[in-house]
């Protein structure tokens, strides 16, 4: 793996640390490498949860590497599998990803965090989409995902003026799950990851599949859809060994042993 990415496996948890000088900014080469990491995570049956963070205490990621842009890298360059930062366009990832935001998450860095399932951030974290000030748009998910969380007036201000949002405000709006001290950030992210590992993997996959496919449907239509048999994970989880193991472990007052089948 490149010098820009540090990977650590802790049992079934994969930790990815983005480590690039000048604000952990991401060029096309690094984005390709991140895409390979996330696709390998998706396909590795031994891995259950991923944590993505940035090196240092100032920047999670400043997004697209503007130095690379100044040297000719185009905004519509091929950023590799998974889109920008390797995660923003993986739409079929049925394992959870936690963004441990250790500082500024600007532009594509914020979009990377928004592509995760959970955001745990340090109290010094700050979020912004300043692309309009650079003559471009946050088209790696920012302008698409943020309106699903925030009211239109707040979205407009963030994407059109580049307004920054601090950690506590992001928590109030429901953008982030937790705000902790810098010193507690990774321990907190690992604690959340372990809680996810304690849940059945097929159930997690089914939940993500249901969210992904029914989020824009009326509730009644969504009910019919998930029971129609077209989904991959939901029908299988109902008849899985894990669906037997969970109640059995509860009755026997022990921790369940998940098999993922």
UniProtKB/Swiss-Prot annotation:
<dbReference type="GO" id="GO:0008809">
    <property type="term" value="F:carnitine racemase activity"/>
</dbReference>
<dbReference type="GO" id="GO:0006635">
    <property type="term" value="P:fatty acid beta-oxidation"/>
</dbReference>
<comment type="subunit">
    <text>Homotrimer.</text>
</comment>
<keyword id="KW-0456">Lyase</keyword>
<dbReference type="Pfam" id="PF00378">
    <property type="entry name" value="ECH_1"/>
</dbReference>
<dbReference type="InterPro" id="IPR018376">
    <property type="entry name" value="Enoyl-CoA_hyd/isom_CS"/>
</dbReference>
<dbReference type="GO" id="GO:0008735">
    <property type="term" value="F:L-carnitine CoA-transferase activity"/>
</dbReference>
<comment type="similarity">
    <text>Belongs to the enoyl-CoA hydratase/isomerase family.</text>
</comment>
<feature type="active site" description="Proton acceptor">
    <location>
        <position position="131"/>
    </location>
</feature>
<dbReference type="InterPro" id="IPR029045">
    <property type="entry name" value="ClpP/crotonase-like_dom_sf"/>
</dbReference>
<dbReference type="InterPro" id="IPR014748">
    <property type="entry name" value="Enoyl-CoA_hydra_C"/>
</dbReference>
<dbReference type="InterPro" id="IPR001753">
    <property type="entry name" value="Enoyl-CoA_hydra/iso"/>
</dbReference>
<comment type="pathway">
    <text>Amine and polyamine metabolism; carnitine metabolism.</text>
</comment>
<protein>
    <recommendedName>
        <fullName>Carnitinyl-CoA dehydratase</fullName>
        <ecNumber>4.2.1.149</ecNumber>
    </recommendedName>
</protein>
<feature type="active site" description="Nucleophile">
    <location>
        <position position="111"/>
    </location>
</feature>
<dbReference type="InterPro" id="IPR022852">
    <property type="entry name" value="Carnitinyl_CoA_dehydratase"/>
</dbReference>
<dbReference type="GO" id="GO:0042413">
    <property type="term" value="P:carnitine catabolic process"/>
</dbReference>
<comment type="function">
    <text>Catalyzes the reversible dehydration of L-carnitinyl-CoA to crotonobetainyl-CoA. Can also hydrate crotonyl-CoA to hydroxybutyryl-CoA.</text>
</comment>
<dbReference type="GO" id="GO:0120092">
    <property type="term" value="F:crotonyl-CoA hydratase activity"/>
</dbReference>
């Amino acid at each position: 793996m490149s010098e820009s990415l540090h990977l650590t496996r802790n049992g079934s948890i994969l930790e990815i640390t983005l480590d690039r000088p000048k604000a952990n900014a991401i060029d096309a080469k690094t984005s390709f490498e991140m895409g390979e990491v996330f696709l390998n995570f998706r396909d590795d049956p031994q891995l259950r949860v991923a944590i993505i963070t940035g090196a240092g205490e100032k920047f999670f990621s400043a997004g697209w590497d503007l130095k690379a842009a100044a040297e000719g890298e185009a905004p519509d360059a091929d950023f590799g599998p998974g889109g920008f930062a390797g995660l923003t366009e993986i739409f079929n990832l049925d394992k959870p990803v936690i963004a441990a935001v250790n500082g500024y998450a600007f532009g594509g860095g914020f979009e990377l965090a928004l592509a995760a399932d959970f955001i745990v951030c340090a109290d010094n974290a700050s979020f912004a989409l300043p692309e309009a000030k650079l003559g471009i748009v946050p088209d790696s998910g920012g302008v698409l995902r943020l309106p699903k969380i925030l009211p239109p007036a707040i979205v407009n201000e963030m994407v059109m003026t580049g307004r920054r949002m601090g950690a506590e405000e992001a928590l109030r709006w429901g953008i982030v799950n937790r705000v902790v001290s810098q010193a507690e950030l990774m321990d907190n992210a690992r604690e959340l990851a372990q809680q996810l590992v304690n849940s059945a993997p097929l159930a997690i996959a089914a939940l993500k599949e249901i969210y992904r496919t029914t989020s824009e449907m009326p509730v009644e239509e969504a009910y019919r859809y998930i029971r129609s048999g077209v989904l991959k994970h939901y029908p299988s989880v109902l008849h899985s060994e894990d669906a037997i193991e969970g109640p059995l472990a509860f009755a026997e007052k022990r921790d369940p042993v998940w098999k993922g089948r």
